Amino acid sequence: MKAETPSFEAHQFVRVRRGDAVRRLIQRDKTPLAVLLMAAVVGTLAGLVGVAFEKSVNWVQNQRIGALAQVADHWYLVWPLAFILSALLAMVGYFLVRRFAPEAGGSGIPEIEGALEELRPVRWWRVLPVKFIGGMGTLGAGMVLGREGPMVQLGGNIGRMVLDIFRMRSPEARHTLLATGAASGLSAAFNAPLAGILFIIEEMRPQFRYNLISIKAVFTGVIMSSIVFRIFNGEAAIIEVGKLSNAPVNTLWLYLVLGMLFGCFGPLFNFLVLRTQDIFQRIHGGNIKTWVLMGGVIGGICGLLGLMQPSAVGGGFNLIPIAAAGNFSVGLLLFIFIARVVTTLICFSSGAPGGIFAPMLALGTLLGTAFGMAAIPLFPAYHLDAGTFAIAGMGALLAASVRAPLTGIVLVLEMTDNYQLILPMIITCLGATLLAQFLGGKPLYSTILQRTLAKQEAEQAAKAQQAPRENT
């Protein structure tokens, strides 16, 4: 006797039942399994967006450089074209941010910190396209910005998007997926999973609600984003500096001196960032046309600088291995360092969609290498390697400015694959952090968040005062 085949209606009934079961599981906000499943989804999406963002920025840069190469033999064409192309790309980023999502300007990390405390909105339907396309414009223009800040904000917004799509209503899931997305975004930007975890625990420690569910979710998301990154980009170190020699014990005091140097520079750098932000605020006064034109001028100047001194612009990832290899003299290293300090301050403080992690890593490399090369003739018996000071300097400025020494240490070691330098890294970053704190320096991202919240309160107070007048 022939067995009866299930009818179409039976197939549909089973499919609906399965869909309802999955939906009920996910909507149990207190179920750790549901949070972990969503964390895996968030991490996977953050990894995919991170890879797409990196390749999109590289494509824009290659198209811009390729267009300039076509007219490289005609100086009267290449200089105006370099300015115009970079200016137009930058203006796209500035316009999108100012017109559609002001919170997408700058790094975006303070916005995620504010969102974790439920003090700042997360409008993912606006921020995701604006930050992605705007970042393509500003980074593609050659401005001195990094992609890590945008990736943290994109990742956090992906976390909130997933939460809204699956209608998970518990405050715990709301907070956890936002943090998971931020950690996954940093991991996808640098291929540094442990640094992504530490960044949430250390830098966002006042906002992050640490418990077993949240930390497992962060781990899950970071694992998935790292797997996605390595599928597309391979498992090699993101910054190729080669295997450097370990630092002998009798040279470790030099790394403490280097850390103290960064401990002095870190608070000064933060002060300059904030003052430069105030200057730009006075220049454009909130006017969108002035703001976009100003951004176009900055982008165009970066395009011209890229022709004269390519090492002075861009995120700095290409510069780091060249500088760490000792290919520049001490004088040239210091010149590029000063030039990049100026360009970093201008590009980041203007409110362009882009991060400051990568530019700070490049600054730390330049100053660390210069210190090491200056120390080599002073202490010939030590047989010093300037590259080890470059690696130590990379994390030291991050530690002094952002006040996240653990993140700085692990991030640099993961990016360069030089884990044998962990002891000099610890000494340098700890010295930088302690001295920066002693000098009264405040963490950069926390300070920017406080200023943003103060501005938000002032705007709300102004609206509250204006409302009664309109009603009368």
UniProtKB/Swiss-Prot annotation:
Give the location of motif Selectivity filter part_1 in residue numbers: 106-110
Task: Identify the residue ranges that face the Cytoplasmic compartment according to the record.
Answer: 1-32, 117-123, 167-176, 202-214, 282-287, 439-472
Q: Which CDD domains match?
A: EriC (cd01031)
Reactions catalysed, as given in the entry: 2 chloride(in) + H(+)(out) = 2 chloride(out) + H(+)(in)
Where on this chain is Selectivity filter part_3 (motif)? 355-359
- Keywords on record: Antiport, Cell inner membrane, Cell membrane, Chloride, Ion transport, Membrane, Transmembrane, Transmembrane helix, Transport
Coiled-coil blocks = none
Q: Where does chloride bind?
A: 107, 356-357, 445
Xref: SUPFAM superfamilies: Clc chloride channel (SSF81340)
Give site residues, Mediates proton transfer from the protein to the inner aqueous phase. Answer: 203
Q: Name one GO molecular function term.
A: antiporter activity
Q: How does it assemble?
A: Homodimer.
Q: What does this protein do?
A: Proton-coupled chloride transporter. Functions as antiport system and exchanges two chloride ions for 1 proton. Probably acts as an electrical shunt for an outwardly-directed proton pump that is linked to amino acid decarboxylation, as part of the extreme acid resistance (XAR) response.
UniProt record similarity statement: Belongs to the chloride channel (TC 2.A.49) family. ClcA subfamily.
The entry's protein name is H(+)/Cl(-) exchange transporter ClcA
Tell me the organism: Klebsiella pneumoniae (strain 342)
Q: What is the lineage of its organism?
A: Bacteria, Pseudomonadati, Pseudomonadota, Gammaproteobacteria, Enterobacterales
